[in-house]
């Protein structure tokens, strides 16, 4: 069984070194307690795939020193939520595996929007899915878990609610991204 203590923590912690240090103390305490309850439990913390190569990489590496696995979410998007080409999957997976080192890589969320507003399409989304499966096969057993987030598009009201929740209710691209992941 896997336990991730935190989801996309790099988004919240950013480049705030004291916040990373405080989170590391919390994480190590929570992980220690969880291991006492179930020594067979595999414990990690989830970050975005971008954290492997941005300003958070060193902090995330330190946080993962005591993890049993490295967990990431993977959505190949630009900062404005437009899509990167589906062909980036191979190099992105290699970067994530390299970042994970000898530890297993858990892809807690994987997705690619199909919205034309974001420069995508159903065909691009399908190519992304094919490329993910090919890269997963190529990784051998290094990725024990991969989860596609949303296998269907959600209702516009849900996208609006998520936009408000994330403080991005005025971002048409963010909502187009969320509404076309399925």
Language-model-detected regions and their locations in the chain:
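Active-site groove signature of glycoside hydrolases
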Residues: 1-20, 44-46, 107, 144-152
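Aromatic- and acid-rich polysaccharide-binding/catalytic face
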Residues: 1, 5-7, 45-49, 53-94, ...
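Aromatic-rich peripheral "rim/lid" segments of glycoside hydrolase catalytic domains that contact
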Residues: 62, 117-118, 122-124, 138-182
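An active-site-proximal structural segment forming one wall of the substrate-binding cleft
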Residues: 1-5, 22-37, 56-66, 130-139
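Aromatic-lined substrate-binding rim segments of carbohydrate-active enzymes
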Residues: 17-45, 86-87, 99
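Short, glycine/charged-enriched secondary-structure capping and boundary segments
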Residues: 17-20, 58-60, 85-86, 120-122, ...
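Catalytic-core region of carbohydrate-active enzymes that cleave or remodel glycosidic bonds
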Residues: 83-145
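Extracytoplasmic/secreted cell-surface and envelope-processing proteins
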Residues: 12-16, 53-56, 79-82, 114-118, ...
